[in-house]
Amino acid sequence: MENQFLRTEMVLGADGMDALRRSHVAVFGLGGVGSYAVEALVRSGVGELTLIDDDTVALTNLNRQLEALHSTLGQSKAEAIAARCRDINPAVVLHPIVGRYEAAGRERFFDAKYDYILDCIDLVSCKLDLIETALTRGIPILSALGTGNKLDPSQLQITDISKTYGCPLARVMRKELKARGILHTRVLFSPELPAATEQKEAPPPGRRSVPASLTWVPGCGGLMMGGEAVLDLARRAKEEAK
C-alpha cells in the first residue's frame, strides 16, 4: 500500500510518524506565516489540526497566503485552508474555527487538548494572553514576531524571547511578558531592519499602518515554525520511547 508520507518517515522513523499522527496542533492566525505553517504540518502527517482565524480571503492576500486564490475570495480563511488540507491528506482531522482569539473568550479555543500551539496572531494583546495561557497549561507554544516590511528570509531565527534583538515587536513582547512574570518562550523573529515602504491602503481599526509583506519572508517563517513543531513532536516521542 502506498504511503504519502514515506519520504518523511525515512527521516523521522516509524515512531516519529506515529507520534505525528497522534498529535493535535492548533494554529492561531492563518495569514502569510500561519498558512505556510499549516502546510508544513499537514504535509508532514500531523493527524489533527485546529485552524483559527476570524478573517475572510481578500484580494490583497493573494501575494502571500496559501488559501488565497481567486476562487476562494470572500471565503473564511479557516474553511478555505481546511479544504486545502483535506485535499492534501484526506485522513487529517480538522477543526476550522472562524473567530478571533481574545482573553475574554479564550475558553472557546481550549475545549480540546493540544500537543502544540503555533501563534501567528498579529495583535500584541492577543499574543500575550495566548502565550500566557499556553505556558500556564503546559502546552508547548512557538510565536511569530512579525515578518512584515522584511526582505531577507535568511535572517529569520527561532530562539528564546530573551535572546531576541533588533526587532521592535520583540522588544515590546519582552517588556509585556516580563510584566506577566514570563521571561522565556520560543519565538520566530528577524533582526532585519524594516524596509522603507509606501502606504497604499487605510489601516484597519486599532492600527496605525498596514505592514508591507512579500511572498517569501512570511512563507519561509511559516515553514520554519511548522517544521519546528514537527521535529519537536517527533523528538519527544523518541525520548519517551527510551
Describe each PLM feature range.
Residues E2, F110-K113, I121, S125-C126, ...:
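Glycine-rich phosphate/adenylate-binding loop
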Residues I97-R106:
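Conserved SAM/SAH-binding loop
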